Amino acid sequence: MATQVKKELVAELVEKIKKAQSVVFVDYQGIKVNEETLLRKQMRENGAEYLVAKNRLFKIALKESGVEDSFDEILEGSTAFAFGYNDPVAPAKAVFDLAKAKAKAKLDVFKIKGGYLTGKKVSVKEVEELAKLPSREQLLSMLLNSMLGPIRKLAYATVAIADKKEGSAE
């Protein structure tokens, strides 16, 4: 690759790293093209992005982004990157689901290597725990449901009292 092209790629990666709430590092070797296409589509739908870049260029981009943690042990071999822009859980969830399916099929391919979440390096275990969390929308709906529960009960109680008074007045 020409030096200018590499500089442009690094600049692009720096922008993505700064914009992302989370980045998941994946060993993508052995994944089928149709599975990768489906993963990319799923990521786009959830405000995330999946791409493959050279490890050396990604290391340079991390340094230029101001990331102080070392990712040398993670950035070895075939590495793909899943960036989460809107929801930090989305890329972890999508990648984890595919990795879990591959492990269930007893295939030793497509493994999570680690991640980067809001300024700090995270382990494989932490990425898996993040993937098990509900999405932001699910959390908001759970919160709203718990807030509306008491109001709903109060409304039912007042209707029941009104019906009871109406029944005794007749």
From Swiss-Prot:
The lineage of its organism: Bacteria, Fusobacteriati, Fusobacteriota, Fusobacteriia, Fusobacteriales. Gene3D superfamilies: 3.30.70.1730, 6.10.250.290. It comes from the Bacteria. Keywords: Ribonucleoprotein, Ribosomal protein, RNA-binding, rRNA-binding. Forms part of the ribosomal stalk, playing a central role in the interaction of the ribosome with GTP-bound translation factors. This is Large ribosomal subunit protein uL10. NCBIfam families: PRK00099.1-1. SUPFAM superfamilies: Ribosomal protein L10-like. The keyword rRNA-binding applies. One of its GO terms (biological process) is translation. Pfam families: Ribosomal_L10. GO terms for molecular function: large ribosomal subunit rRNA binding; structural constituent of ribosome. One of its GO terms (cellular component) is cytosolic large ribosomal subunit. The keyword DNA repair does not apply. The gene is rplJ.
